[in-house]
Amino acid sequence: MSTATHKLLKGATGDWEMVIGMEIHAQVTSNSKLFSGASTAFGGEPNSHVSLVDVAMPGMLPVINEECVRQAVRTGLGLNAKINLRSVFDRKNYFYPDLPQGYQISQYKSPVVGEGEVLVELDGGRSVTVGIERLHIEQDPGKMLHDQSPSLSLIDFNRCGVALMEIVSKPDIRDAEQAKAYVTKLRSIMRYLGTCDGDMEKGNLRADVNVSVRKPGGPLGTRCEIKNMNSINFIGQAIEYEARRQIEILEDGGQIEQETRRFDPDKGETRSMRSKEEAHDYRYFPDPDLLPLEFSQEFVDELKAKLPELPDQKKTRFVADFGLSAYDASVLVAERESAVFYETVLDKLGDRARDGKMAANWVINELFGRLNKEGRDITGSPVTAEQLAAIIDLIGEGTISGKIAKDLFEIVWQEGGDPRALVESRGMKQVTDLSAIEKVVDDIIAANPDKAAQVKDKPQSLGWFVGQVMKASGGKANPQSVNELLKSKLGI
């Protein structure tokens, strides 16, 4: 059930609504290709991971890779989708130099996964449910290289035959924000499942985006497809541009041509590639070299029983068990590695219920803040979960103050080391000796008689005195003791 309001675009004739559907091409995580034993490793020398099957040598027959089927079924289960116990591989016929067979082995009428849905969270606590039409398995074609020779186009077949999952959404997406959030959520689910690494820079996750516009609540318009998007930000830019392009044409009295377009990131615009093909243009028919794919319900149930905890389930648990806000829990579970880091911190602290909120604050505000500033991800964090847990522990037991903890975090970030040993060796322990704190308090009050006289009328100025005492003590004074002493001496 959608709770999201969506963005309408203003035109000369009033508001327009976007209608967006997406086809996500996700490379299956497996050691070998869909129908051959060739390696799927990224970055090899051109044409070094190629078998005779991949390049369609005469007499070579495809043999299905069971692991790819397992990964597709696991993904379908993660999308709350219907798993079809019988599916069929079809030949999708078209000519392109990077497709040596002259056809692509795909699935048309009988895909391995049927309808499902994904809950997509948006800013401000809003959400939208995007329906999944189907998930089918197909071969990736090769890669054409046009910049290696002034007169030739070269082909690298390393990618040819690698297993792809094509995840087709229903046209439930209504603006660029929802589209970006949908791709982000799909990628997160597949990373949790281990079925696709989602690395868009390597081409392991690509999106075809279908965009049309209409008057709100009106009939669906003619759609254009933007091909091979490999960046979430570019997806957002392409949708905005394409929708406005269509609105301008319609408001000028023109008609939208159904076509395939590509996005030019340098100019921020879409450009026509070719007219959009219909299914009959591909002359689909069942592949005679492959039997129908059949498996039992027990096979599906066994895979379902072994699924890991997925982002939505983990978020619900974090809110219930650790008292986190829905927002904080969403941030922590967005990437599997972030959730693992957070739970490792809690394991080291020992009392999950007690320390959950404090650990979340440190992970989100201090750690993630610093990682984002330096353009790193959690796997490249200089501060380990064990080190962060030790810092939080030192605060909890009163050994250091929150301010000193931030200084300690900076030292560990830059130099590494054991936080407890650093506190000892650098004299960073919190001062809890009341007589020592009292002397500093007395000195601050004596140096500011006017402010001290006004504090009864302006109780909020107590914070200024606390700040001065903490500054004078180098941040080492126990904040609770400072507050109590100041209130006593100032008569508040």
Swiss-Prot record:
| Molecular function in Gene Ontology | asparaginyl-tRNA synthase (glutamine-hydrolyzing) activity; ATP binding; glutaminyl-tRNA synthase (glutamine-hydrolyzing) activity
GO BP terms, alphabetized: glutaminyl-tRNAGln biosynthesis via transamidation; translation
EC class of this enzyme? ligase
One Pfam family of this protein, by short name? GatB_Yqey
Q: Which SUPFAM superfamilies match?
A: GatB/YqeY motif, Glutamine synthetase/guanido kinase
Q: EC number(s) of the enzyme?
A: 6.3.5.-
Keywords, alphabetical: ATP-binding, Ligase, Nucleotide-binding, Protein biosynthesis
Tell whether NAD is among the UniProt keywords.
Answer: no
Q: Would the keyword Membrane be found if you checked this record's keyword annotation?
A: no
InterPro entries assigned: Asn/Gln-tRNA_amidoTrfase_suB/E, Asn/Gln-tRNA_Trfase_suB/E_cat, Asn/Gln_amidotransferase, Asn/Gln_tRNA_amidoTrase-B-like, GatB, GatB_C_1, GatB_Yqey_C_2, Gln-tRNA_amidoTrfase_suB_CS
Catalytic activity field:
L-glutamyl-tRNA(Gln) + L-glutamine + ATP + H2O = L-glutaminyl-tRNA(Gln) + L-glutamate + ADP + phosphate + H(+); L-aspartyl-tRNA(Asn) + L-glutamine + ATP + H2O = L-asparaginyl-tRNA(Asn) + L-glutamate + ADP + phosphate + 2 H(+)
Q: Which PANTHER family match?
A: GLUTAMYL-TRNA GLN AMIDOTRANSFERASE SUBUNIT B MITOCHONDRIAL AND PROKARYOTIC PET112-RELATED, GLUTAMYL-TRNA(GLN) AMIDOTRANSFERASE SUBUNIT B, MITOCHONDRIAL
What functional role does this protein have? Allows the formation of correctly charged Asn-tRNA(Asn) or Gln-tRNA(Gln) through the transamidation of misacylated Asp-tRNA(Asn) or Glu-tRNA(Gln) in organisms which lack either or both of asparaginyl-tRNA or glutaminyl-tRNA synthetases. The reaction takes place in the presence of glutamine and ATP through an activated phospho-Asp-tRNA(Asn) or phospho-Glu-tRNA(Gln).
The record's similarity note reads:
Belongs to the GatB/GatE family. GatB subfamily.
Subunit info here reads: Heterotrimer of A, B and C subunits.
Listed name of the protein? Aspartyl/glutamyl-tRNA(Asn/Gln) amidotransferase subunit B
Q: Which organism is it from?
A: Bradyrhizobium diazoefficiens (strain JCM 10833 / BCRC 13528 / IAM 13628 / NBRC 14792 / USDA 110)
Q: What is the lineage of its organism?
A: Bacteria, Pseudomonadati, Pseudomonadota, Alphaproteobacteria, Hyphomicrobiales
Name the gene: gatB
